[in-house]
Amino acid sequence: MTTMARQERVRRAIEFQRPDRVPIVFWNRNQTEGDVLLYHLALGAPGDGTANAWDWSVNEWGYHLVKSGDGTMGHPVEPVYRELPRTVAAVSDRRKVGPDRGAGRIDDTARPAVAPYHDRRSATAATGEEFRVPALREEERMSAAPAFFEKCGDRYRLASFDLSGFTVYTFLRGFENAMQDFLLEPEGFAALMDRIVEFECDLMRMAARHGFHGIHFADDWGTQSGMMISPPLWRELFKPRYAKQFALAHELGLHTWYHCCGEFVEIMDDFREIGVDVLNISQPNVNDIAEVGRRLRGRQCFMMPISYQTVSITGTPADIYAEAERLHRLLGTPDGGFIGYVEEYSVMGMSERNYCACGEAFRRLRC
């Protein structure tokens, strides 16, 4: 019997076309044991760090993640922009939505002044007078791609923003400032947010040119008990922007993968409506998975971990196997719609035994 190519297995799971088994993604360790390999699109500031690695100290947008030595990615402690960049009249060399200007372009009726990216240490972001959009830096950003593609073989090639959209906005403005911007500074918020969205659209075009199969978004909308902002406000401010990005991804031939931490059941149907192909519910322990299945099973492909707050940390291998079966039963179908997700989380207390059990749990599943 011929084994199905791994990229084909993933595609069939996403599109409900009967893969031969449940695909598995190993996220941060042992990636070649899985069906998907991840390529990091984020860069450091020019001259800081290397491509396809998180070894930079200052991100290309200008934010700095302070590491605490516990193995996590770190936390932003200083906003890049203490004041919102001023808005100006339309900039003539920026692109607009229109049939002759390409899909996914963002209108430029009011924009912050834009300066070329330079070393943030000599910048004047605190004045609120300019906003620096990262350069595409395609040659540098794709410098690790040839070796990555060779390593991929027949695996699915997933390009990741690493952190995207809303999360980037909160890093630039600081979380408290960002939350106030949504209500008190709607025009300034829109101007800055659209620059972020526009840059991500350019990265998607680049990823498609280089032969990736999917694009990965990472925004956290949930807390342990509900959303950070109200669903109506999310639908007003963010849903239309995501819809434009997902439509562009599909025009480019890319699947859309969306990661979200926290409890966000109220907007999961919205993500399906606007074109998310793979929804990663990162914390199944705080979401009503049975309710999610009733709403979306058979229509939405899910990428699911064994909870790295509960079962994969404190459970036994038998508990982990049972949880994988439960998630698959509630969300998967014989035609597909389910991808297993394995992440090494010793920083959260995950044992080596339980890490290995997570991979084995998904290997045991059958569509």
What are these regions (language model features)?
Residues 1-25, 29, 84-367:
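Active-site loop segments of alpha/beta catalytic cores
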